[in-house]
Amino acid sequence: MSTIIDIHAREILDSRGNPTVEVDVVLEDGTMGRAAVPSGASTGAYEAVEKRDGDKSRYMGKGVLEAVAAVNGEIADELVGFDATEQVSIDRAMIELDGTENKGRLGANAILGVSMAVAKAAADFTTQPLYRYVGGAAARILPVPMMNIINGGEHADNPIDIQEFMIMPVAAENIRDAVRMGSEVFHTLKKELSAAGLSTGIGDEGGFAPNIASSREALDFILKSIEKAGYKPGEEIYLALDCAATEYYKDGKYVLSGEGKTLTSEENAAYLAALVNDYPIISIEDGMSEDDWDGWKALTDQIGDKVQLVGDDLFVTNPVRLAEGIERGCANSMLVKVNQIGSLTETLQAVDMAHRARYTNVMSHRSGETEDATIADLAVATNCGQIKTGSLARSDRLAKYNQLIRIEETLGEIAEYAGRSILKG
C-alpha cells in the first residue's frame, strides 16, 4: 500500500519570483507527499548543482523545465514501484541514476524535490508527523531561532558587507515565546530605523535593509531595539552574524567595501574577534571564505572556544567537506541546507557526522524560499537545537515559525525548547 505509483513535478515560483521545482509523490493507497525546493543567492562553489534551463527567453534563463522533465521522466520511471518507506534506497537509486559527483546531470533540485516528497508521503502513510517519522521517538527539541533582522551583502541592496545580523532569544520558555520576543524586537527596530530616517524596506529574508555602511552601526541599532523592547542583550537575547565572507574575498584579501577596508585573513580574524569582544555575539557563520582553510583555522584558534563558528559555504552540508574541516580543526558547527547536498539521506548523514565530531548543527532555509516548511520538521527530527529561517516578515519565513509552534503544541509536555543549552561554556 505504500508503493509509489506516481511522481509528478511542476515549475512554481519561489519568494524571489524565480522558478523552482515542486514535486508530488502519490502512493498506492492515495496518500500524497508534496515538496518544494529552495534556492540560494550566495551559493557555495562546492554545492550540488541546481539545474537551470539557461533559456534567456524564459525567466531570464532561470527556468527549471529541464529539472521538471527529469523528475517526470527518468526519475519517475526509476522509482515507480518502490516502497516509499525505503528512503535510503530511493535516494541512493536517484544518486546512481544521476551518475555525477554533484548531481549535475539530473539536478539537485530535481532529486531533492523527490526525496522530500517521498519522506512526506511515507510519513502520512504511517500516520506520523514528518518530524516523528524522520527523527523517531527522541525528536522533541524545539530549536532556538536565528532571526535575521538586518540584511546586507547579497541579500540586500545596501552597502553593508556582512550579510545577516540576527537575534537569538535564548531566554524564552518555549518556541511560542521565542517567536514573540523576536517579533517585538523586529517591530521595535522598525521604529528605530524609521526615526533615524532610514529605510524600512526588507531584504530577501524579511530583515530590514537600511542604507548604513558600518557593521557596528547595524549592531548598535539592534542592541538599542532589544533594550527598548524590554529585554537584556547578552542575557535574554544574543546576537549572531552571517558574514558570507566568500562574497567579499578577492585575490586572497577580504574587501569590506562598505567600510573601506581590505584585510588579510589574520586581520579579518582580528576584526571579527573585536566584534565578539564588544558585542554579545555567540555565533558567526562563514567568517572566512570557503577556500581559506588557513583563515578558518586562525579564526577557530582565536575565538572558537567562545563562539559558535558555523561553516556554510565551507561545508555545504557535504560529509566529504565536513570531514576535511574536522581533520583541520576548522569551525565547530555546520549549517544544514538540504539543497546543498540534494537528498534527505545525505543531509541526515552529514548531521550525524557533525554530531559525532561534537560540532553543532544549525538547520537552515535559503534566501529563495517557498511556503514549504519541511526544515521546521527536520530541525525537530534531528534535535539540532538551532534553526535559521529568516525574519519576522514574509510568509515564506513565517511558515517555518508557525510550523514549529504547531509541532510544539503537538508534542505537548515532552517538548523542550533548546534555549540556553546552546550557549558555549
UniProtKB/Swiss-Prot annotation:
Main location: cytoplasm
Compartment(s): Cytoplasm; Secreted; Cell surface
Active site: 205 (proton donor), 337 (proton acceptor)
Keyword Lyase: yes
Xref: InterPro entries: Enolase, Enolase-like_C_sf, Enolase-like_N, Enolase_C, Enolase_CS, Enolase_N
An example Gene Ontology molecular-function term: magnesium ion binding
Lyase recorded as keyword: yes
Gene3D superfamilies, per database record: Enolase-like C-terminal domain, Enolase-like, N-terminal domain
Any single Gene Ontology cellular-component annotation: extracellular region
Entry EC no(s): 4.2.1.11
Family: Belongs to the enolase family.
Entry protein name: Enolase
Source organism: Ruegeria sp. (strain TM1040) (Silicibacter sp.)
Gene: eno
